[in-house]
Curated annotation (Swiss-Prot):
Listed Gene3D superfamilies: NAD(P)-binding Rossmann-like Domain
Residues of the transit peptide: 1-69
Key words of the record: Acetylation, Chloroplast, Plastid, Transit peptide
Classification lineage: Eukaryota, Viridiplantae, Streptophyta, Embryophyta, Tracheophyta
GO molecular function, one term: copper ion binding
Name of the molecule in the record: Uncharacterized protein At2g37660, chloroplastic
Organism: Arabidopsis thaliana (Mouse-ear cress)
Similarity comment: Belongs to the NAD(P)-dependent epimerase/dehydratase family.
Keyword Transit peptide in record: yes
SUPFAM superfamilies attached to this UniProt entry: NAD(P)-binding Rossmann-fold domains
InterPro entries per the UniProt record, alphabetical: NAD(P)-bd_dom, NAD(P)-bd_dom_sf, SARED1-like
Length: 325
């Protein structure tokens, strides 16, 4: 930083020309600094030669230390939500869009129809998570990834609930849990790692500790087994992560229940095994902002509406979690 070497006897400080001092600030003609910066001037007495020579005020050499402290600016995080066309994914994407000072939201969907459904423009990409190349444009330049993709079973036609029994399910060709919940999620993790993302939030399901869980029998496809494998792959990736294993998802308003965290499916042994999609979405968004959420895996459910105290302190919520997987 260059300083003027002219001294003056008409100004209280021998290093600063009189016409550069205004109410404690330094004019930009003297020192070039950002408008948001602050300057602090400290007078030091020294026996060494000053750039300005002796001061007529003290007879001693004086120098000025200029400290430039630019105002801290935080750039919004660019966050990609995959599965943004799904019921929970839509909510996460919307929440990120609403907090534009903190996030730049991107979405990844499978079809043009899904893109139109969420009013997606240039920030919503169409891709197939089973094909790494097709998701590369969406991942490029992101800071964080929220994975909300999942295989979706279809009910076989002809089921009549009046006759009792249970419905049967199947998965479309190419859309089995192994292909979507394992290979598809692995592709996303690999692509994100290559792009240098700082965090991945993965939404899964409770029940993965029980190989005989009823969800594994749907379509005979072991959906929880493949989900668990993807979660382990993420935990081993070295990328800061938050794994959220949600209870039974409900299409209800969020923000009005006390949220509960657990581990190893212990919440499945209680009466509090469900959670609103909107609450899961909020936990995803909060995880992107809190260091306490990183390198943690948690089961997530809520107390019934009207009991307990609605959760507002998410830092405290994540602090309760001690498990990494």
């Amino acid at each position: 930083m260059a300083m003027m070497t002219t001294t003056t006897t008409t100004f209280f400080h021998p290093l600063l020309p009189a016409n550069t001092y205004k109410s404690g600030a330094v004019a930009s003609s003297f020192v070039s600094v950002p408008r948001s910066s602050s300057l602090q001037f400290r007078s030091l007495v020294s026996d060494s030669t000053s750039i300005c020579g002796p001061s007529k005020f003290t007879g001693k050499n004086r120098r000025v230390s200029v400290t430039v402290s630019a105002a801290a600016t935080t750039e919004p995080l660019t966050v990609l939500v995959t599965g943004a066309g799904g019921r929970t994914g839509q909510i996460v994407y919307k929440k990120l869009k609403e907090r534009s000072e903190q996030f730049v939201a991107r979405g990844l969907v499978r079809t043009k129809e899904s893109k139109e459904k969420i009013n997606g423009e240039d920030e919503v990409f169409i891709g197939d998570i089973r094909d790494t190349a097709s998701i590369a444009p969406a991942v490029e330049g992101i800071d964080a990834l929220v994975i909300l993709t999942s295989a979706v079973p279809q009910m076989k036609p002809g089921f009549d609930p009046s006759k009792g029994g249970r419905p049967e399910f199947f998965f479309d060709d190419g859309a089995y849990p192994e292909q979507v919940d394992w290979i598809g999620q692995k592709n996303q993790i690999d692509a994100a790692k290559a792009a240098g993302v700082k965090q991945i939030v993965l939404v899964g399901s409770m029940g993965g500790t029980n190989i005989n869980h009823p969800l594994n029998s749907i379509g005979n496809a072991n959906i929880l087994v493949w989900k668990r494998k993807a979660e382990q792959y993420l935990a081993d990736s070295g990328i800061p992560y938050t794994i959220i294993r949600a209870g039974g998802l409900q299409d209800k308003d969020g923000g009005i229940r006390e949220l509960l965290v657990g581990k190893d499916d212990e919440l499945l042994e209680t009466e509090t095994r469900t959670i609103a999609r909107a609450d899961v979405a909020e936990v995803c968004v909060q995880a992107l902002q809190l260091e306490e959420a990183k390198f943690k895996a948690l089961d997530l459910a809520s107390k019934p509406e009207g009991t307990g105290t609605p959760t507002k302190d998410f830092k405290a919520l994540f602090t309760q979690v001690t498990t990494k997987f």
